């Protein structure tokens, strides 16, 4: 019984992480770089945000 409960908790934890990754949006002043393989963010034109800050974020098509 303990093994089933542990497996359920781990599965739910992984599911929450997966959902969080899929719905990540770029920070304010950044936009999704659709040309990048990993769908990283980049600064919007005219934004003062540094590229390093935007690159630290990932986004997915449909959420950017």
From Swiss-Prot:
Location in or out of the cell: Secreted
Protein name stated in the entry: Putative neurotoxin 5
Cysteines paired by S-S bonds: none
Post-translational modification remark: Contains 3 disulfide bonds.
Keyword Signal attributed: yes
Main location per the UniProt record: secreted
Signal peptide feature range: 1-18
UniProt entry keywords in alphabetical sequence: Disulfide bond, Neurotoxin, Secreted, Signal, Toxin
Similarity remark: Belongs to the scolopendra neurotoxin 6 family.
One cellular component term from this protein's GO annotations in UniProt: extracellular region
Organism for this UniProt entry: Scolopendra mutilans
Any one GO molecular function term: toxin activity
Domain of life: Eukaryota
């Amino acid at each position: 019984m303990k093994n089933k409960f542990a497996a359920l908790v781990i599965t739910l934890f992984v599911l929450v992480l997966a959902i969080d990754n899929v719905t990540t949006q770029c920070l304010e002043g950044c936009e999704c770089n659709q040309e990048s393989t990993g769908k990283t963010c980049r600064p919007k034109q005219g934004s003062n945000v540094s590229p390093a800050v935007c690159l630290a974020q990932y986004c997915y098509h449909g959420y950017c």
